[in-house]
């Protein structure tokens, strides 16, 4: 789990997301509170409940991006799901308890990687022995093995092809849910897993180079050294205490007019979410998981519905409200130039693969921001995503002809931008006026 201070978390988010300081502060405090709770006396620790967050803001202002970056920072089981993917219990589709089962799977993966790192040195030694077995056979004399070991460590045999046997994790046969049995999705039944256990762990033969074989062999040997029961126990504990669920598109399941039909199912999803957010026990194939201390961050654009359209009980379980403001011209400028992987940096790097140098003047960046703001105000406000439309239109000709212009330098100024997006800016969606 991360030990970053709220200020450090916000500064990390600032590298990728422009503005929205209030939302960043809220998630930074919530993340830090996870760590603070772990430092408390056990008797008080159980009483401290997470303060769930509701982020409200138009599309394209950074709600989902905050969740993506937070997942990398959290160092804890984290899952992002769309509320629209779930249906009420009794309907065909996934029920909301699947969120927690998926979160436990994320926790299992995190703990397994941590345990593998702890035994990597031992696993590397065993992997080297297996590579030597593949190179010289198990009956070779000690002198021959040592001779090949030296060559192996010097990298002389890196490109030599060998046949190795590794555990077959078996992605061939997928999983399936038993229809008509709500309790049966205690985890999707995985056929490969069942057959693997029945046959005492299957292996498969792989032909690969010596250098590439180490990845599979080290993973294989690491898994032999770690105890799966310990991993499962730790993963469940980590999920219960540090787990974070990011619920996107929650506005899409808000009842708008109280109408029947599909609306019943939408409200049903909200009702199913209530116990999950409040705290319940979910059955998973790794055992029961309590959701009392899992942090829920919900977000939605609320273009058509309002936060007050959510069930009052669900509103009460999302006590912290954060509003993300729409983006202005200055924000667009900063998105184009200041973020870690800004669009301009991305396009420059893409063109450099064709030996083409791309340069944007300051007035070109101003013009790009202007066009994006104008289109958002006149057509539909889709936030920062509008910049991708504008950039693609501006660079369409350059991208198409790049292989023929290899070795040249191109400077893009405001005149070039206006020339290539002029029709885009004036041609607001006329189709809406055509009968």
Swiss-Prot record:
Q: Which GO terms describe its biological process?
A: protein unfolding; proteolysis involved in protein catabolic process
* SMART domains to which the protein is assigned, alphabetical: AAA, ClpB_D2-small
According to the UniProt entry, its GO molecular function terms are: ATP binding; ATP hydrolysis activity; peptidase activity; proteasome-activating activity
The record's Gene3D superfamilies line, in alphabetical order, gives: 1.10.8.60, P-loop containing nucleotide triphosphate hydrolases
Protein's cellular compartments: Cytoplasm
Q: Where does ATP bind?
A: 18, 60-65, 248, 313, 385
Q: Which keywords describe this protein according to UniProt?
A: ATP-binding, Chaperone, Cytoplasm, Nucleotide-binding, Stress response
Question: What Gene Ontology cellular-component terms does the record carry?
Answer: HslUV protease complex
Entries under InterPro entries matching the protein: AAA+_ATPase, ATP-dep_Clp_protease_ClpX, ATPase_AAA_core, Clp_ATPase_C, HslU, P-loop_NTPase
Tell me, in one coarse class, where this protein mainly resides: cytoplasm
PANTHER family registered for this protein in UniProt:
ATP-DEPENDENT CLP PROTEASE ATP-BINDING SUBUNIT CLPX-LIKE, MITOCHONDRIAL-RELATED, ATP-DEPENDENT PROTEASE ATPASE SUBUNIT HSLU
Protein family (similarity comment): Belongs to the ClpX chaperone family. HslU subfamily.
Self-association state and partner proteins as the record states: A double ring-shaped homohexamer of HslV is capped on each side by a ring-shaped HslU homohexamer. The assembly of the HslU/HslV complex is dependent on binding of ATP.
* HAMAP family on file: HslU (MF_00249)
Described by its record, this protein's role is as follows: ATPase subunit of a proteasome-like degradation complex; this subunit has chaperone activity. The binding of ATP and its subsequent hydrolysis by HslU are essential for unfolding of protein substrates subsequently hydrolyzed by HslV. HslU recognizes the N-terminal part of its protein substrates and unfolds these before they are guided to HslV for hydrolysis.
This protein's name: ATP-dependent protease ATPase subunit HslU
Give the organism the record lists. Rhizobium etli (strain CIAT 652)
